[in-house]
Amino acid sequence: MLDKNQLEKYNQEHLYEYEKLMSSNEKNALDEKVDQLNLAEIQDLYQDLYVNRKTIDDVSSVSEVKYEVKSRLNEEERHTYEQKGYEAIRNGEFAVLLMAGGQGTRLGYKGPKGSFEIEGTSLFELQARQLIRLKEETGHTINWYIMTSDINHKDTIEYFKQHKYFNYDANHIHFFKQDNIVALSEEGKLVLNRDGHIMETPNGNGGVFKSLKKAGYLDKMQQDHVKYIFLNNIDNVLVKVLDPLFAGFTVTQSKDITSKTIQPKDSESVGRLVNVDCKDTVLEYSELDTDIVNQFNNANIGIHAFKLGFITSAVDRELPYHLAIKQLKQLDENFGVVERPTLKFELFYFDIFRYGTSFVTLQVPREEEFSPLKNKEGKDSVHTATEDLKRMDLI
């Protein structure tokens, strides 16, 4: 049975009332789950990120990152980078890591977001085609690591099976799941999902490296003599997956972290890649004062290459949580299903940057390499993604 005094200490006494209405099996499951939780840490998260949340309005320690602009590279530089990139890919120096833990809910679609199809071509297939082309050009089959989540893991694997892995070698596609963390109400209370269990949500893309390690894939990369991990997410329909120019730029610069960015539009709600206290990092749009956000010229588009040695040395180090507030369905006090604002705590992959020692950025043309698919209609929508894919002759 739940410890009422312990629950009251951490503002979770409502669970004691819930328990009175539960069956024996439900009570046992709730008790077991609560025993696994560190209620003090959960309360600290709530206080730090919600009650005392703040934006960054002091930018005295924030400066522009060092970056090169792709459009300013001359033909000789482009050729040199591309040839070095092809050579590195041919020699097996790169693995590709895709973050694809989301659902297509905001697109009005029930399956994994990566399985969403635009005129018959899914987001997964758009990326698989590029890996197939690289294999044809280099003779090397790149290992493709795909991070899923509890909500879409089985469906993602099944989708790949149904589509015969898009003619890519299934032995070189590796799926693994990100971890979860509890969600809270705006009052700081644990909430129950529709099944009557304590609600947990994916812990954000920042868990990608620990999850990769837990699955044994960091060890595999070392055994395969991989030197770099190319990282991207499923949202960007124009992503150039491990394009040889960027691969060559990465190898030539030989930094812990190599990033792609675009020039942001004024007040565009996308994170800014900046330098803070001599470390590159991403400041989320929501964390920056609106008067400050337009001072910086590099918008983060979630495309990076990491030295494997850097990731293995930093993977176990602590990352901070960030707050997101979402409308989520849950049980109310009478076990009825309601939709309420819910606090989600997320890790961001770019917080690992703080442990790096060397950084470089390549700013690329937005119209060629960035078209996020986030909404069913309007901005960053199915329509805009479709138009951009057609413009680039990708569908």
UniProtKB/Swiss-Prot annotation:
It is an enzyme of class 2 (transferase). It comes from the Bacteria. Its EC number is 2.7.7.-. Keywords: Nucleotidyltransferase, Transferase. Disulfide bonds: none annotated. Gene3D superfamilies: Spore Coat Polysaccharide Biosynthesis Protein SpsA, Chain A. Coiled coil: none annotated. InterPro entries: Nucleotide-diphossugar_trans, UDP-sugar_pyrophosphorylase, UDPGP_fam. It holds the Pfam family UDPGP. One of its GO terms (molecular function) is uridylyltransferase activity. UTP binds at M99, A100, G101, G102, K113, Q178, G204, D235, K344. Belongs to the UDPGP type 1 family. This is Probable uridylyltransferase SE_1761.
